[in-house]
Amino acid sequence: MLMPKRVKYRKTQRGRMKGNAGRGTDVSFGSFGLKAIEPAWITSRQIEAARVAMNRYMKRDGKIWIRIFPDKPVSKKAAETRMGSGKGAPEFWVAVVKPGRIMFEADGVSKEIATEAFRLAAKKLPIKTRFIVRPDYEG
């Protein structure tokens, strides 16, 4: 699972996901990308499941880039705990994804293979996504 090696603060406030992504909206490493259309928290397990799905379909061909990183801890109180007595312990890590963000990129495979790999990866994610091709791609 992806998670930071160390953080300044163990627990964070939940915050809100307003507006569109300001950066990370262009395909910059590969030729194909998977773009988020809805805002969401993507957990490290979901990122890993999507990565495994893409790798299994693409086999040894091509390269995959993960453009999001789960750097936000989400805390949770134990089951059947009374209110109060502080905030719960960090339970899992999430990446805050806003609309327009490129989450995954791929290169070194045909457009058909990349489309199918991203389709399988999108099934593992809790949001609507769109397949993006780099503007200067010729294939």
Swiss-Prot record:
SUPFAM superfamilies linked: Ribosomal protein L16p/L10e
Description of how the protein assembles with itself and partners: Part of the 50S ribosomal subunit.
Keyword RNA-binding among record annotations: yes
UniProt keyword annotation of Transmembrane helix present: no
PANTHER family per the UniProt record, alphabetical: 50S/60S RIBOSOMAL PROTEIN L16, LARGE RIBOSOMAL SUBUNIT PROTEIN UL16M
Name of the gene: rplP
Listed NCBIfam families: rplP_bact
Protein name: Large ribosomal subunit protein uL16
Gene3D superfamilies: Ribosomal protein L10e/L16
Pfam families: Ribosomal_L16
Species this chain originates from: Chlorobium phaeovibrioides (strain DSM 265 / 1930) (Prosthecochloris vibrioformis (strain DSM 265))
Function: Binds 23S rRNA and is also seen to make contacts with the A and possibly P site tRNAs.
HAMAP family: Ribosomal_uL16
InterPro entries in alphabetical order: Ribosomal_uL16, Ribosomal_uL16_bact-type, Ribosomal_uL16_CS, Ribosomal_uL16_dom, Ribosomal_uL16_sf
GO cellular component labels: cytosolic large ribosomal subunit
GO molecular function, one term: rRNA binding
Domain of life: Bacteria
UniProt family annotation: Belongs to the universal ribosomal protein uL16 family.
A single BP term in Gene Ontology: translation
Annotated keywords: Ribonucleoprotein, Ribosomal protein, RNA-binding, rRNA-binding, tRNA-binding
